[in-house]
Amino acid sequence: VDEIEFAAELGCQTIKIASADINHFPLIRAAAKTGLSIQLDTGMSTLDEVSRACDIIESEGNSNIIIHHCSFGYPAKVENINLGIITKLKEIFSYPIAYSDHSIGMQIDIAALAMGVDIIEKTITEDKSTPSVEHIMSLEPHQLKPFVNSIRDVELAMAQNELTKKDKEKRDLIRRSIFLKNELPAGHQICEQDLTYRRPGHGIQPDQLHFVLGKKLKLDKSPKDMLELEDLID
């Protein structure tokens, strides 16, 4: 608890509660009283334990909470990372959800981002060969920029949840429209054998075939020209 006061005096902007201390209510309460942002590690904790820790923080008038999903192990084994809990945390809590990574590489961080985490915590080291459990799973300085760029690429890829203007433009170029196979005279009644389907898709779409069959041509029509509804009469 004394360390909490010391951290606040140093001007820290946030205090991180380790997974091992999620039930250390005196420590959590002291951290909450500082009014600083509380980052709550939840490794090996039940959802009830996470909820009770949040309740303690909130009871001190502090709602500036970030909940970290993390897994046991330095480095963590992939089969123990349990990214699925991120979905539950997002459903239950209104606070930002972070992923505190203990795995080697970047792929699990990318997956966590795709699952909707707001923050990713990754440790940095000057030398992975340093004899300590955390160094092997950390990024070296030269890996930091590619890591951040990968995160930004995924964020950009996830930014849209509907067709973009560019999608619609490309869609019309690659889809097909209804054309005549051969030149046909005005008054000809169109049957399916008269038709073919070619790009682009700016004309009558194949799924609108029922608007064409049985209709008559208003004027002579060349196979070079896209068939239009205005070309047809009953």
Q: What is each PLM-predicted segment?
A:
Residues V1-D234:
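Catalytic cores and adjacent flexible loops of soluble metabolic enzymes
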